[in-house]
A protein has these predicted regions:
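Acidic, metal/ion-coordinating pockets
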Residues: 1-131, 135-137, 167-179, 243, ...
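Catalytic centers of hydrolytic enzymes
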Residues: 22, 97-338
Length: 338
């Protein structure tokens, strides 16, 4: 059986990342290109077409409804882990999670260039019961050896569960925002709603590598600037639309921008421009004044020429001063309509 595998890059790379870093490349949702590619591989004799996609789960579901001839979409980017495939017409969409937590097994029954049946299984990975490959382990150890002492240095400890995922906040992000507020002497902190980075359990040592695992970006400068209340509202509205726009093709994936020192209410059922209300400066309890300027610290700006220390150094310095970090529950965001 001839199987064609088509790669689909993340379509929003120039928006979600600094476009000035890759000016010679172009990205986007281009259903006509995908349709042409499917037709091309089918004409070349492919009996099964698999798309290896970084679109995100919702975008892949819509693409499956628009582009004919795809049998399987192996969906990435949004880190969803689903025990059963999502079926769109004659296409199955499979989401297998992230960080090596699962591997999906897919058995297909292909006859006369048609998928007439399938079996799938989402298999959890328990690393402590799988014997590592000795040759690969040795190669990894060799590559890490020059950096091992730096990576394994203990910076502090956590009393709290540190996790990334959450539509509006996560304790890792709360800790990063706390670091931005204190180390950059700011009233408000903004941190991107990225989904990567493993969790840490209460009582664990925090090593430098643990910090790198949740902050490593090629544009990690921690800026400090002034923003008006109006601009803060615009930013929150813009990010919210990337997540809650009813059309998946306008969703970039990821979670809501994390905020430190700033509370707000969001109604996810409203249209863009009407979702965010009750912006509040938490240290005073006062509503944000649209015309007033506030000192804001953040990182991962897509703007060229951003100035500031690297975010991993900011977080490391904060944790060193704390010794043991404790992150309490975050109730600064009120969600309506979810």
């Amino acid at each position: 059986t001839k199987i064609a595998v088509i790669g689909q890059a993340f379509p929003y790379i120039p928006i979600a990342n600094p476009s000035w870093m890759f000016p010679e490349y172009s990205f986007g949702i281009r259903d006509e290109n995908m349709s042409a590619m499917v037709a091309e591989v089918r004409a070349a004799g492919a009996e099964c077409v698999v798309v290896l996609s970084h679109n995100g789960f919702d975008v892949d579901k819509k693409m499956a409804s628009v582009v004919p001839g795809i049998d399987v979409i192996l969906s990435g980017h949004t880190h969803d882990a689903l025990p059963e495939p999502y079926v769109v017409g004659e296409t199955i969409v499979i989401a297998s999670g992230s960080n090596g937590k699962f591997v999906s097994r897919v058995d297909l029954d292909i006859r006369d260039a048609r998928m007439i049946g399938y079996r799938t299984k989402l298999i959890p990975i328990f690393s402590d019961v799988i014997e590592p490959d000795k040759e690969v382990s040795a190669l990894i150890d060799q590559q890490r050896a020059p950096y091992q002492a730096e990576l394994s240095e203990v910076i502090g400890q956590t009393d709290s569960l540190l996790y990334r995922r959450g539509n509006f906040n996560g304790t890792w992000d709360d800790l990063i925002c706390d670091a931005l507020l204190s180390e950059r002497d700011a009233e408000i902190a903004l941190s991107p709603g990225v989904r990567w980075g493993p969790s840490m359990l209460p009582g664990q040592d925090i090593t430098r590598e643990d910090i790198y695992n949740v902050t490593s970006m090629t544009y990690g400068e921690a800026y400090r600037s002034e923003m008006t209340g109006h601009m803060l509202n615009v930013i929150l509205e813009d990010v919210a639309d990337n997540i809650f726009n009813p059309d998946p093709y306008y969703q970039q994936g990821g979670d809501m921008v994390r905020t430190g020192g700033l509370g707000y209410t969001i109604d996810v059922t409203k249209p863009q421009g009407e979702r965010i209300s009750n912006l509040t400066l938490l240290k005073t309890g006062e509503l944000i004044d649209p015309a007033k300027a506030y000192v804001v610290a953040g990182w991962a700006s897509v703007n060229e020429g951003t100035d500031g220390p690297q975010i991993w150094d900011v977080v490391e310095n904060h944790i060193k001063k704390q010794g043991t970090v404790s992150v309490s529950g975050n109730n600064s965001v009120e969600v309506i309509g979810a």
